[in-house]
Amino acid sequence: MFKTRERLQWKDVRFLTKKRQVFSQGLLTIFYVEQYPNRKFHQFSFHIPLLVSKRAVVRHKVKRILINSLEKQISTLNFWWKYYKCYITLHKMKLQQLLEILDKKNSNQLISYLENENTKAFTSFCQFLWKKH
């Protein structure tokens, strides 16, 4: 779980979605903006839509897997020359494979699938930011 200062507040989420700087790769869609110059840390927030499951327990499980995966990657990602605010959500049009895995109720397969998608998305995001700056 992220520390409180590393989590986005709702006013930040609204700002990011209005700003419309978006990166989409595979299952994840990332809304991002550069962090304020006086803040030397990243801020992240995840949103799991109701299309995944109407049960909050299932959505929370997916969210925890993504958060843990991102925490593992943070030390190895290569976009630390600048700090960012990122709001991450699942791409609603690409949920079919995730829903099939959730129907099977195979926890290990779910974890490996989400970690793989998260890794691919954030390495592509880092490369995108590197080319941009």
Please provide the spans of the model-predicted regions.
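Positively charged, solvent-exposed patches that mediate nucleic-acid binding
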Residues: M1-H133
